[in-house]
């Protein structure tokens, strides 16, 4: 286990919670009755502690090695992560093998939308620029 990655995970979860607490305090109408609090405060990204995610993430971000094998292992771990965590928008895309159906975007429940926003916003909290989420979204919106 990596001290650096453990520290990152703790900080990330703390920042996700900080975003949610800010929303609760300043925009309570969007959090009340959402059912999002448990996932955001207690269970966010819990799967990142699973060995098949933890190891590849740790090596990719903190191992100082971006070999083909390391990158492939990370990509597999990322795929596992988004399929285990419904706060990722990719979780809600159904890729069919029937060409007439193609890709179908399913409706994402509101509680996971809140968690997704807090997840994105957590990086703004880390950087100390709470408005950074808007420029990030502007850069990525056409791919989401």
Question: In which residue ranges do the predicted regions lie?
Answer:
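Metal-dependent phosphohydrolase cores
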Residues: 1-144
